Amino acid sequence: MNQLEYLKKYTTVVVDSGDINYIKKYQPNDATTNPTLILKSVLSNKYNYIIDNSIQYAKDIGGNKLTQVKNASDMISVGFGIEILKYIPGYISTEIDARLSFNTKKCVSKAIKLIKLYNNNGIDTSRVLIKLAATWECIEAARQLKKIGILCNLTLLFSFAQARACADADVFLISPFVGRIYDWYQKFNLNSPYCSNTDPGVIALKKIFFYYKKYGYKTIIMGASFRKLEQIQELVGCDRITISLDLLKQLSMKKDILIKKLDVKKITKVNTKPNALSESEFRFLHNEDAMAVEKLSEGIRQFSSDQQELENFLFDKL
């Protein structure tokens, strides 16, 4: 057995990619996309049929050019999701426009639109997760969406306050960004020499894992944005782990045994949950974490920029 096969024994493996050919190759259970990955796939010229179908859809719906760009962009995200779902048994995560990250009402509206697009194309929407940045507004949107049967993946999660608020809202799944937490500490040379069990990203995810399991929260934890194999190896047993194509390939080539590091059975359960965070408590606690404030803002800016680049590309095509 290789390490990827060992990992699959203890953890649900998810591919973080918009490259359908690689998803076919590595056969993950689930897959995630984001604006950066979608843009990369669009510009690769491998999936022009998805682009062409999306542009035709937008033209058929009509409206002014900006409206058509928005509709084509939404259909591209859904189009990649539809194709990926053909090759996985589980969930696809489709991210909404990051520029909506501070508007609960618009997040809810966009999520409903994307789910309708999936439904109109014959997809079982119980297999679709809507990705939202873990801002207070998006966490509230996820709470509202769950009440109408739409499940969400709260992404760009860096602080324990974000994790607590997501648990309070009973969101379906969170994605703590292990690698980007590590990046921040590396930038300031605060984690050298490297050791996986002192990696700040690994420590952050473990803290969330033990908190959720101790208090019986149902929210699924999916480690994300890994930079090193050692980070993944240290988190074997996490509910889910989403992995880039490069690290998947490395895992598939290693033959060493992987040991389960996170074991729910070893955690003592507590029946009474902590009091839910208020909005002001959430904002204060999140603000206390300089890394989380910087990385959440940076992530939203990057995804917003890539979304705008995709729309510029579509504007020229329409």
Swiss-Prot record:
Pathway in which the depicted protein is active:
Carbohydrate degradation; pentose phosphate pathway; D-glyceraldehyde 3-phosphate and beta-D-fructose 6-phosphate from D-ribose 5-phosphate and D-xylulose 5-phosphate (non-oxidative stage): step 2/3
From the Swiss-Prot or TrEMBL record, state where the protein is found: Cytoplasm
Q: For this chain's UniProt record, which GO biological process terms are given?
A: carbohydrate metabolic process; pentose-phosphate shunt
> So where's the catalytic machinery, residue-wise?
K131 (schiff-base intermediate with substrate)
Q: What is its main location?
A: cytoplasm
- Its EC number is 2.2.1.2
Q: Name one GO cellular component term.
A: cytosol
Query: In UniProt terms, what function does this protein have?
Result: Transaldolase is important for the balance of metabolites in the pentose-phosphate pathway.
What name does UniProt use for this protein?
Transaldolase
Q: Which organism is it from?
A: Buchnera aphidicola subsp. Cinara cedri (strain Cc)
The gene from which this protein is expressed is tal
